[in-house]
A protein has these predicted regions:
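ATP-binding/phosphotransfer module of carbohydrate and carboxylate kinases, centering on a glycine-rich
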Residues: 6-7, 24-34, 76-163
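Phosphate-binding/catalytic loop of phosphoryl-transfer enzymes
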Residues: 1-89
Length: 163
């Protein structure tokens, strides 16, 4: 893709990168530390002595674990699991199921046409419900936090290092 951009612009010396490295520069400057970019999508980056290691940022279909979109998708999965009897329903799962039409088919229809931001719109409600003790929401938040810790550890981060 970088070559296509350089060719289209008529430039000889061009480096085209995704936004993860610029996020590291913006967050850390030249300092060492870990950046967790968690919004609609997600990535982690660790900078040590000017060298940057990257993890994630592969987009909604293949990654973005612990992101708002991931939380929303997993909430809908949790609703379907509750309907199937393999997960416990909660106030949040019952409410969202009703809002989307009340049937598993309504969940599937919504998900089939949903963008990452459509899934992510559930994230603030998941956070709020977790803070109020909703078991399903807490499980989703804990799963996301566990992923972020595994990813940070995989990059070599340790407690006490800038985050």
């Amino acid at each position: 893709m970088g070559r296509k951009v350089a060719h289209a612009l008529g430039l000889r010396n061009v480096v085209v990168e995704d936004d993860r490295r610029s996020a590291v520069v913006g967050a850390l400057g030249s300092a060492d530390g870990l950046v967790m970019g968690v919004g609609t999508g997600s990535f982690l980056a660790r900078q040590v002595r000017g060298r940057v290691g990257l993890l994630g940022g592969w987009g909604f279909r293949l990654g973005d674990e612990a992101s708002g979109a991931d939380l929303g998708r997993k909430l809908l999965q949790r609703i379907l699991h509750a309907v199937d009897g393999i997960a416990q329903p909660s106030d949040l799962t019952d409410t969202v199921l009703a809002e989307l039409g009340g049937t598993p088919a309504d969940i599937v229809t919504f998900a089939g046409g949903a963008s990452p931001s459509d899934f992510a719109r559930f994230a603030p409600r998941i956070v709020a419900a977790a803070q109020q003790g909703d078991a399903a929401a807490r499980a989703l938040m804990e799963e996301g936090a566990a992923y972020l810790m595994r990813a940070a550890t995989a990059l070599g981060w340790s407690a006490g290092e800038a985050l």
